[in-house]
Structure formats: structure tokens, C-alpha cells
Amino acid sequence: GFLSTVKNLATNVAGTVIDTLKCKVTGGCRS
């Protein structure tokens, strides 16, 4: 349903943001 789609998008965005912050903090960017 719509809510689960929104939840999945929010989870993906949060994961991306967290990965980016970790990467900047540790200097271990892969991209």
C-alpha cells in the first residue's frame, strides 16, 4: 500500500544519508 511505499522510501533515504555521513566521517567514500 501507499504507507509501506512511503516507509520504504524513507528507509532508503535515511540509509543513504547515514552512509554518506559515515563515509565523510571515516574518509572511506567508495563512490
Curated annotation (Swiss-Prot):
InterPro entries: Antimicrobial_frog_2. GO terms for cellular component: extracellular region. The keyword Secreted applies. It is found in: Secreted. Pfam families: Antimicrobial_2 (PF08023). Disulfide bonds join C23-C29. Keywords: Amphibian defense peptide, Antibiotic, Antimicrobial, Disulfide bond, Secreted. Expressed by the skin glands. It comes from the Eukaryota. One of its GO terms (biological process) is defense response to Gram-negative bacterium. Antimicrobial activity against Gram-negative bacterium E.coli. Belongs to the frog skin active peptide (FSAP) family. Brevinin subfamily. This is Palustrin-2c. It comes from Lithobates palustris (Pickerel frog).
